[in-house]
Amino acid sequence: MSGKITDFFEKKTTTTIDEAENKDNDKELTSTTTTTTTTSTTSKKKVAAAPKKKAAVASKKRKHESSDEETDKEEQQNDDDDDGEEKVENNNNNKKLKNEEKSEEINSTITDNNYYDDIENYFTDKQWKEALSGEFGKAYFKKMITQLNKRYSSKEKPIYPPKNEIFSAFNYAHLEDVKVVIIGQDPYHGKGQAHGLSFSVKKGVSPPPSLINIYKELETDIEGFKRPLKNGFLEPWARQGVFLLNAVLTVEEATPNSHKDFGWADFTDAVLKILSKQDQPIVFILWGGFAQKKEKLFTNKNHLVLKSGHPSPLSIKHFIGCKHFSKSNEFLKSKGIEEIDWKITE
């Protein structure tokens, strides 16, 4: 921009000077023509005056050039100032963007950490919380909780059980008081069913098919057991030391096994290893091929492992008649441990 302004001033100045010189020359010619009768002395004065006029014009031209140079310098300085201000503004904007990005990253971390703290606080039993503290700090667990946080927050598809009931199985009995472990695959995926205990449903929810078959087996296995028609809430078992653990602790609505790759298997395998190391005798009940793959985790000979088909209607013939409930009580009694009252009332 400064170059264009300078060219304009130079052209304008040159034109003005040329016009001045032409006017002076015209005056001289006119003067010479009209004063033919004037004395030679007067002509000499006019000739002597001409160099003075030219000198004045030249001086005027130099002033214009000097003014143009100063204008160029001022414009260049202004351009430099503008560039400097623009650089400062860009630097400030970059710093602002970096600070905003860092703030977002920190906020994201805080959100994840707060959720992680909440999850840990869902363990109300101190023994379990202490026993699993090493798992809480592992990368797979943090990644899993972060992923679950996004799924629960998005609300695109309901996740079961509710977040505060994921670890319900750990809060009914101390680690040292566990007597029987019944392993399920993943939670019920219907609305209002799952609440953190394998095979159990919430109060007021009718028993699902697998639980109905469990009740049928109890009717033939445990004397005096009467099958409840409308109650599938197995909390009374959990309070006596029956650890109802699903291998995968969360699921999307209407999508069984949808969270099987989240990392839950690593966590629940760690739980089963902890149980296997316990000195008190425990009965591990494995229904179906999925649960029976966990048998390799139980290396302590103090424990009893019972296996059969799954109580699902698809494999009922391999389940009915297993008598796992009476066998569990017989084992506990032989070890001097109080038996389980399997009764569930309406």
From Swiss-Prot:
Protein name (Swiss-Prot/TrEMBL): Uracil-DNA glycosylase
Low complexity biased stretches: 30-42
HAMAP family, per the entry: UDG (MF_00148)
Gene label: uglA
Documented EC number(s): 3.2.2.27
Pfam families reported in the protein's UniProt record: UDG
Acidic residues composition bias: residue spans: 67-86
Compartmental location: Mitochondrion; Nucleus
Alphabetized SUPFAM superfamilies for the sequence: Uracil-DNA glycosylase-like
Function noted in UniProt: Excises uracil residues from the DNA which can arise as a result of misincorporation of dUMP residues by DNA polymerase or due to deamination of cytosine.
Catalytic activity field: Hydrolyzes single-stranded DNA or mismatched double-stranded DNA and polynucleotides, releasing free uracil
Catalytic residue positions: 186
Xref: PANTHER family: URACIL-DNA GLYCOSYLASE
Keyword RNA-binding attributed: no
PROSITE patterns the record matches: U_DNA_GLYCOSYLASE
GO cellular component, one term: mitochondrion
Organism listed in the record: Dictyostelium discoideum (Social amoeba)
